[in-house]
Amino acid sequence: MLVDSSIPQLVVPIEGWVRENIAVTDTKNKEQYRFGMPGPMIKEQEWKKTLEQLEAVLIEGDILVASGSLCPGMPTDFFASVSKIAGDKNVKYILDTSGEALLKGARTGVYLLKPNLGELATLCGVKTISFLELESIAQTFLKNNPCEVLVVSLGPQGAVMLTAQSVDYISAPIVCQKSTIGAGDSMVAGMVLALAQGKSLQEMSKYGVACGTAATMTSGTQLCKRKDVEELNDWISSNSSTSQKIKINV
């Protein structure tokens, strides 16, 4: 797929097989079950080679995305090591992971994090976060950690984008969902594209929500369609709020 799309690649060979994740859809109850495999054991020389290759190809001004879970054998501070490389190269580092890898990666320094409410709760050391608590807890996190932008995913309700100066609530329209596979990744991809095009953070977060929402309108592992993305982005741009202080109502 990458070759067909003329996307340059740098592959780091490993001894094990690439992992597979399986999604099963119950068409009767409209429920989807996902089975995420842990993946092969990654040897020390393999993950170290990945860091070496990354350091060799990054240049100032790049946008770097690290996403997904770590395979067995990889240290939980792997994304923290990536963060140090990104800082040395002066690139925008976007991290989208969970658990201990998220905690260690976020504390080392990132440009943007895209947690959901549960992941944000983990980052902030609390059990749960309600909508009413979201703004104050997220702003406290930004104040105490080396992170410039938080985009908190709210699923079908959209997202909240926070910086030290502002809070933006991005509404998502109600659509006919066929599958949520790849919605989060599509959201990140949309934000990266907007950043690469020089768009503002507000435009970035709206376009990300548009891509994530559009991905739910396609079946199985199909990607979002550009026509859907553009139509959704127009709607979102007309129905979102930007302010210095915004109240999020339940």
Task: Locate predicted features.
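Structural motif
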Residues: 62-63, 149
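Short hydrophobic/aromatic-enriched beta-strand-loop microsegments
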Residues: 6-12, 111-121, 168-174
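Amphipathic, non-transmembrane alpha-helical secondary structure
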Residues: 48-55, 59, 80, 103, ...
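Short, small-residue-enriched loops and turns at beta-alpha junctions
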Residues: 40-43, 70-74, 101-103, 158-159, ...
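Conserved beta-alpha-beta core of the PfkB/ribokinase-like small-molecule kinase fold
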Residues: 63-134
